[in-house]
Amino acid sequence: MIPDMSRFQSTGSPQAVAVKNKVLKNTYMLLSASMIPTVLGAWVGINTGFSLFAGSPLISMLIFLGVAFGFFYAIEKTKNSPVGVYLLLGFTFFMGLMLSRLLGFALGMQNGAQLIGLAAAGTGGIFFGMSVLSTTIKKDLAPMGKFLFIGMILLIVASIANIFLQMPALMLTISLLAVAIFSAFLLYDLQRIVNGGETNYVTATLAVYLSIYNIFSNLLFLLMAFFGGDRE
């Protein structure tokens, strides 16, 4: 579960329609481009057997969070230059590597490819739905950000706790809540872009990407838990 602090910056005053449309267009273009290194990273991870969590799960998670927040910091500092774009694409490659273990486990199931397809379709459906809602909901969702942030922190704490507890029911609950919370985050971030609250497309892309990533990975986990076939 990967948080992004940039989404909690002040939305500022409304921007001109032309500027908002440009940010939205550039965000969608960069978001589409970011899927290429993600897929590449996942492919490399699956074919090399990459697994950051092969050792101590707690230490591995702390290393992962350290690397992720390092990327966040670097992207934020360079978001107004081409370096920020390259760092974002590098981050999405890293996230693809991290996703490879889950994908590899899914592909080991008889219906794994179908489950991955369903998770991708479900994520696409949620993204489309939130995109439509972001342009039709008139109410400002900015106050919702604080509650979503608290929910995200609780999810991270629960995930770390479950490393020791190893409770399947808690894992399922965390994934269900993650899908709901990051779907809400997606709506929140998209509305900020549409309303001109976010004027940097690199920052906007990072926020939207993280929501999509978390929705997909948790949807896939749930599908595997409830509908996964026998291991091949």
What is each residue range found by the language model?
Residues 1-232:
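A hydrophobic alpha-helical transmembrane-helix feature that marks the membrane cores
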